[in-house]
Design a protein with these regions (language model features):
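Double-stranded beta-helix
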Residues: 2-13, 104-131
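A short glycine-rich, His/Asp/Glu-containing loop-to-beta-strand
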Residues: 18-61, 66
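Flexible, glycine-rich phosphate/dinucleotide-binding loops
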Residues: 39, 78, 123-124
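Hydrophobic/aromatic beta-strand elements that line small-molecule binding cavities or substrate pockets
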Residues: 46-49, 93, 103
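Short, conserved beta-strand element in jelly-roll/cupin
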Residues: 47-50, 62-79, 117-120
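A generic "binding-loop/recognition-motif" signal
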Residues: 65, 85, 101-102, 110-111
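A generic structural motif
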Residues: 80-82, 106
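Short acidic-glycine-tyrosine-enriched beta hairpin
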Residues: 83-100
Length: 131
């Protein structure tokens, strides 16, 4: 495999990737975009979509990572960030969630779909209470 600065060429098409339920949240399905493999785990990217009829638990949590960006492609989602309040993200909205920020997903539309990019690809999540 050819590598450029530790990265391999990678392309993912919507009609060849499968959504899987095995992810961080049971009310979402995840489709990996191959970025984790192409970067040896330095970055991760996946499409996340809502499982219709399932709702968020609204639990406060934070992630131990260096970068996390969310871009909504369809539907809407309401996040609450500690010290930043509630924010409605709609199709076209983008949020950078700084490392360690406490947040929770309060509710979402059944047609929610978003792209999440993280560094690194694998990271730990801590369940936390709000302060």
């Amino acid at each position: 495999m050819s590598m450029w600065k530790g990265q391999a060429f990678s392309i993912a098409h919507a009609d060849t990737g499968a959504f899987e339920g095995a992810g961080l949240r049971p009310f979402f399905e995840y489709r990996q975009l191959g970025i984790d493999t192409a970067t040896n785990g330095a970055f991760g990217a996946h499409v996340i979509r809502a499982v219709p009829g399932m709702k968020s638990e609204g639990a406060w949590h934070s992630h131990d990572l260096d970068f996390q960006m969310v871009y909504v492609t369809q539907g809407w989602v309401v996040f609450e960030y500690e010290g930043q309040g509630e924010h409605v993200l709609r199709a076209g909205s983008c949020v950078l969630q700084p490392p360690g920020i406490k947040h929770r997903e309060l509710r979402h539309s059944d047609d929610l779909e978003l792209i999440e990019i993280t560094a690194p690809a694998a990271f730990t999540t801590r369940q936390e209470g709000a302060e």
